[in-house]
A protein has these predicted regions:
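Short, conserved active-site loop motifs that form the nucleotide-linked donor/cofactor pocket
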Residues: 213, 243, 329, 362
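Conserved core of the PLP fold type I
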Residues: 66-211, 216, 222-240, 310, ...
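Conserved PLP-dependent catalytic core of the aminotransferase class-I/II
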Residues: 291, 304-329
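Conserved core segment of the aminotransferase class I/II
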Residues: 239-308
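N-terminal basic, amphipathic alpha-helical segments
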Residues: 1-67, 272, 276-283, 294, ...
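Conserved PLP cofactor-binding pocket of PLP-dependent enzymes
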Residues: 220, 358-381
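Short, solvent-exposed loop/turn segments at secondary-structure junctions
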Residues: 50-54, 116, 140, 187-189, ...
Length: 408
């Protein structure tokens, strides 16, 4: 059942998801925490990591700028970190959007402790405990964590592996029951990797506007595109403040500093107040270090380097999975980001495969983490951000062999 020698084995593409549209409580945090702890071990090959490999990040420059800022005693208080955030960083964030074709009012930007806080604050601003939130299927578990944390329910919406959330299905769900908000990742969605076409983005924003349905847009991977043009955002098509856009530098510059932001549209006042009540302030030193880097160094040059690396590594990993995984395996075709979503034959249980791989010193992301239901039990997510090496290659081949052993 294992492909070994055919380097031209055909790649089978994923099929659209078909979740059962039932509103359910969310309880995924324990499984995700357990999985992430195993990923954090130093001797494991991190194919299951949700984080980008840090080897391509400019840590020396960032730390030098942070050290220089730390010598300024005027920054030792918290006032510079109070909402909405440090003005220098806010100016650079607004400038970056403008460079990518979207005009942003700097006064709308609220700096947060990573995109996770931005998502949590935006969700809290538009919904209350017990409300139902529409999500993609599969969906990034950080979205599910936010819903779980606030005692809300989630309903999964059918999602196409190339085009994104099924807008007609979302409209039908919103018509049939109260939906407080919709959480989506239109660019390089984790785990599917798709880039939603512009016409579908317009259609989704039009639906949200008509239905008065707030959309929380997770844009953390927007800078990691493989094509020639920076992708548009849902926010760029929003004329009524219905889109709450969240992003961060964690996936493109450094995860260690935990700096994100929100563009909350008409909900800005609520989000700023919640930010103040939640964490009071965002630390000033990492804000200033990143602002200094954006002002002085080649951020775009840095991004071109990691985009090129990720695109090459995505092709290598897709080829290896196609060659060494069991017959019938289906693989995503990411347009950006750094993860592959893989559908294995139905006989393969992802949690069993996860345990077998862990015994071999390899981590993978089991599909259970990306759904509120018992879905994607034969799916896994693999991270291709680490520079390609014999160790990575052996790990991918080993996971393929272990998957084949689960067919017996």
């Amino acid at each position: 059942n294992l492909r070994r020698d055919d380097s031209h084995a055909p790649v089978r593409e994923l099929r659209p998801s078909k979740p059962i549209a039932i509103s359910s409580s969310v309880d995924v945090s324990r499984l995700v925490l357990s999985t992430l702890r195993s990923i954090g071990t130093d001797d494991a090959v991190p194919l299951g990591s949700p984080y980008p490999d840090p080897s391509l990040f400019p840590f020396e420059k960032l730390n030098r700028y942070a050290y220089a800022a730390g010598r300024d005693k005027s920054l030792w208080g918290v006032t510079d970190g109070l909402p909405p955030g440090h003005p220098r960083l806010i100016r650079q964030i607004a400038r970056r959007y403008l460079e990518n074709g979207m005009s942003v009012d700097p006064n709308e930007i609220i700096v947060t402790v990573g995109a996770t806080e931005a998502i949590n604050l935006c969700l809290q601003a538009v919904a209350k405990p017990g409300d139902t939130i529409a999500v993609e299927s599969p969906t990034f578990y950080a979205m599910l964590h936010a819903i779980e944390r606030m005692g809300m329910k989630a309903i999964e919406v059918a999602t196409h592996p190339e085009y994104g959330i099924d807008i007609a299905a979302l409209a039908a769900i919103a018509k049939s029951q109260p939906i407080a908000a919709c959480m989506v990742m239109p660019n390089f969605q984790n785990p599917l990797g798709f880039q939603m076409p512009d016409e579908r983005k317009r259609e989704l924003v039009a639906l949200a506007t008509k239905a008065d349905l707030p959309i929380i847009e997770n844009g953390v991977y927007n800078e990691l595109y493989f094509g020639n043009m920076h992708p548009s955002t849902l926010k760029s098509f929003d004329r009524h403040g219905i889109v709450l856009h969240c992003a961060s530098f964690s996936k493109s510059l450094t995860a260690a500093y935990r700096i994100g932001w929100a563009l909350p549209g008409r909900y800005r006042e609520q989000v700023e107040k919640l930010k103040f009540l939640n964490t009071l302030a965002t630390p000033s030193l990492p804000q200033l270090a990143i602002a200094e880097f954006l002002e002085r160094d080649g951020y775009e040059h840095h991004l071109r380097r990691i985009r090129k690396a990720y695109a090459q590594q995505a092709n290598l990993m897709r080829a290896m999975v196609s060659r060494f995984f069991p017959e019938g395996t289906r693989i995503s075709s990411p347009a950006g980001g750094y993860v592959l979503w893989i559908e294995l034959p139905v006989q393969v249980d992802a949690m069993r495969l996860y345990q077998l791989a862990l015994e071999q010193g390899i981590t993978i992301g089991p599909g259970y983490m990306f759904s509120i239901a018992d879905s994607y039990r034969n799916f896994i997510r693999l991270n291709y951000s680490s520079p390609w090496s014999p160790e990575i290659e052996r790990a991918v081949v080993t996971v393929g062999k272990l998957a084949a052993s689960c067919l017996d």
